[in-house]
Regions:
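Negatively charged, low-complexity tracts enriched in Asp/Glu with abundant Ser/Thr
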Residues: 17-63
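Secondary-structure transition/turn motif
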Residues: 12, 41-43, 82-88
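Intrinsically disordered, low-complexity segments enriched in polar/charged residues with Gly/Pro
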Residues: 13, 55-58, 89, 96
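Intrinsic-disorder-associated interaction segments
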Residues: 4, 38, 42-49, 96, ...
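Amphipathic protein-protein interaction modules
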Residues: 62-118
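Hydrophobic, Leu/Ile/Phe/Ala-enriched alpha-helical segments that form helix-helix packing faces
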Residues: 1, 15, 52-61, 115-121
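Short, positively charged and aromatic/hydrophobic N-terminal segments
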Residues: 1-19
């Protein structure tokens, strides 16, 4: 389940770099290609967690549009990043921010668990 718009390249690049200096992509979804990607470094996650991540990412991009990535910062904090093509007039910046805050509230326990998993990994 790869998509061609650069997320795979970004993911491969992040896994090659020193994780103490750069973010590591956990997963992402792209509304333009209608694809989802999970970093293979995290294939040991339980299937239920992987499925929840997929649903969350795809749901966001279907609702808001653009590209959503979940990334670990060097300190282990999990962040959500959203971007859109410059010519995507349907993408809603304000709606994206509101939806991200909603997801952060609703998925707080999942995010905390993933941060802990990443730190001990």
């Amino acid at each position: 389940m790869l998509y061609e718009t650069g997320l795979v390249a970004k993911l491969e690049e992040s896994t090659k770099r020193n994780t103490m200096e750069q973010n590591v992509v956990l997963c992402g979804a792209n509304s333009y290609d209608q694809k989802y990607y999970l970093n293979q470094e995290f294939s040991a996650l339980p299937d239920a967690v992987k499925q929840e991540l997929q649903i969350m990412c795809v749901w966001f991009t279907e609702d808001i549009g653009g590209i959503l990535t979940l990334e670990f910062e060097p300190d282990g904090t999990l962040i959500m990043k959203t971007t859109a093509d410059d010519m995507d007039y349907y993408y809603d910046d304000i709606g994206a921010g509101l939806k991200l805050h909603q997801l952060q509230r609703q998925k707080r326990e999942l995010m905390s668990s993933l941060e802990m998993y990443y730190r001990v990994m």
